[in-house]
């Protein structure tokens, strides 16, 4: 199966990322601590933002279905932008399946805690998760469900986007202000699955020729298919109503959502 790495400013590069777990059973026993995994939609989701084409977007709900969330220890750092294979010495299943609302909480809220489990100490330097269709709750039947409003020049669109593009991400080290995943015996550490929704809509604060905008769909193509002040669509309707170019771009930008902080992930489909 071909896997593709998605990053904020890099081209899509082939990468073989199926973890080789043959060495896991041979890993030595170690003392344990508590390992957390959090989900983060960043300020774009919690505070709202302006799209590349000037729409002010605010979210009421951003439901994301996540499953098989696994943390890995590996002797060598895993780079999803190469064709290297992830060879873990330890793996921990942290979340079986869960739907989270990334828009939950105030603007300054912490990333959402999905779960914490007892885990062997060590450095967790890779993270994997799948995004299947939710089996229950308000987003049942969909992978992503975005609910909110968009406004531009006095026009308001109340939108509900139900997206069902299933995905699997394999990611390397978290990249951010703090190191994550270093678990000392008897202590606690965390990892983060990060979602960059500016990849879909672009960023009005970035230059038009910035890579975040040149690859983004924006909101204008979605506003154009709204019925009055309402847009309530699923993927089948989007495929029918958007131009082929815009629909393909939407699919590509959805695929590029998954990160670990600013760190990149390799994408594999689930078929």
Predicted regions and their residues:
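Bacterial N-terminal signal peptides
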Residues: 1-5
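Bacterial lipoprotein signal-peptidase II cleavage site
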Residues: 6-17
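Low-complexity, Ser/Pro/Gly/Ala/Val-rich intrinsically disordered tracts
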Residues: 8, 20-26
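A short, solvent-exposed, low-complexity linear motif enriched for acidic/polar residues
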Residues: 24-271
